[in-house]
Amino acid sequence: MPYPANVREIRAPRGTTLNTQSWLTEAPLRMLMNNLDPDVAERPEDLVVYGGIGRAARNWEAFDAIVAALKRLKEDETLLIQSGKPVGVFRTHADAPRVLLANSNLVPRWANWDHFNELDRKGLMMYGQMTAGSWIYIGAQGIVQGTYETFVEMGRQHHGGNLKGKWLLTAGLGGMGGAQPLASVMAGTACLAIECQPSSIEMRMRTGYLDAWTDDLEKALAMIDESCASGTPKSVGLLGNACEILPKILELGRLPDLLTDQTSAHDPVNGYLPEDWNVEDWKARRLSDPKAVEKAARASMAKHVRAMLEFQRRGVPTVDYGNNIRQVALDEGVADAFDFPGFVPAYIRPLFCRGIGPFRWAALSGDPEDIYRTDQKVKELIPDNPHLHTWLDMARERIKFQGLPARICWVGLGDRHRLGLAFNEMVASGELKAPVVIGRDHLDSGSVASPNRETEAMRDGSDAVSDWPLLNALLNCASGATWVSLHHGGGVGMGYSQHAGMVICCDGTEAAARRIERVLWNDPASGVMRHADAGYDIAIDSAREHGLDLPSLKG
């Protein structure tokens, strides 16, 4: 539920001057503020970072209280955050997390949007999404490589590895979906991305994630045709409503080469524009008549999925990109809604089996050169991965930093801790101007239970078992992460996921090195453990290769 907007402009401090008692508390302070940087957040005035109503703090009073608490927090104290509000400071020890966050968690019987929204209206909860409430969102770059890897794998499986002259049709250009146009172009294919909010298109144009836009379907298709004919991939934003435009494209007989969707369908009230509604009426009625909005949005999503199914029937490779739109359509009577797969079981799970996932870091100095130096260090430490090197080169060339300079690359067990230790040494030697923080998306190998996304179609049927993210969070606390978060409902909405996050600060000290080695080994190892337990041979082999002690693993 929106709170009164605040006109303050929040940006993270830069440089080496501390505003807190140590770098271990300066790091969460800067990353909290970075989440609300106007170049990062979708609606910073409302504390909304991305993903519909994913917030960094419950309200502005809570934000100010968090900042004040972090500034006075001692090296042996831990701050507790309950759904975006600071609720306690307790004495722990120097290797304990400095901040523990629990966001949007509800007892399962009450884990639905109606109950959450009631609590939100009363000021008792907030929706943390994944990296909004856990203070490690880095702008659209945070999802670019995962999206790029998915599109590359789609091209490999469906088009012989060559996407030249092909085009992708999708929708949604918010904080997550906004990565699609750039990821598509980087993967070598043109992209037509439908978006209903002009502000989101403007944001993607301003940050370099979108090449062009129009509000005319014929012009958009003409630009796509020109791109495909030239063999030079281009991204085109189309202002409109996906549930209206996809059927029109079908009527024209135009078939894309790939199809997906990243609208905010996880939130039927705040995330999806109903058919034949304008944005202004939608925003007003979200407050005055949310039930009517939800009913209309759900019907529109069903129409959207029916169109996707028809594209699939006509031979277009079609994939759900994790926004729960298939589930809504199924609930609305689309019996075959799950006939097209989710992206994780279709393309990503083999990576998860090896603990490979979205490894990200941010330079607290604010100096882009710190990121460029770490890019080079990654290449030095992982010399035999040309795909990774290509990614880093493309990222430097194509990705504009939003807020504090940051980088993401997908690496796994055996590499993450080596990179963390190297970054820490670079801080200690002065090669980096200030500490860096290392974190990840909650979408990772061992940190999420989400039966319609990350854990869809698990081999042993354990899709809904959420012990795993709880164990991941506990393990990261015990290992010494700088802050640890446990959330509910990210990506797919209330009742459909539980997930955990961690961030570790590399401040150049020997104590940090010990924590880094534990955290950045144990965190991906828990993902290998989870998949080995589910019976995946790749994960079992990885566990044995890395000497993991898994008592239930036979042989």
Curated annotation (Swiss-Prot):
Protein's organism: Hyphomonas neptunium (strain ATCC 15444)
PROSITE patterns according to UniProt: UROCANASE
Organism domain of life: Bacteria
Catalytic activity: 4-imidazolone-5-propanoate = trans-urocanate + H2O
EC number of the protein: 4.2.1.49
Pathway note: Amino-acid degradation; L-histidine degradation into L-glutamate; N-formimidoyl-L-glutamate from L-histidine: step 2/3
Protein name, per record: Urocanate hydratase
Keywords from the UniProt entry: Cytoplasm, Histidine metabolism, Lyase, NAD
Gene it is expressed from: hutU
Residues reported to bind NAD(+): 51-52, 129, 175-177, 195, 241-242, 262-266, 272-273, 321, 491
Cellular component GO terms, alphabetical: cytoplasm
GO BP field: L-histidine catabolic process to glutamate and formamide; L-histidine catabolic process to glutamate and formate
Predominant place of localization: cytoplasm
SUPFAM superfamilies: Urocanase (SSF111326)
Localisation per UniProt entry: Cytoplasm
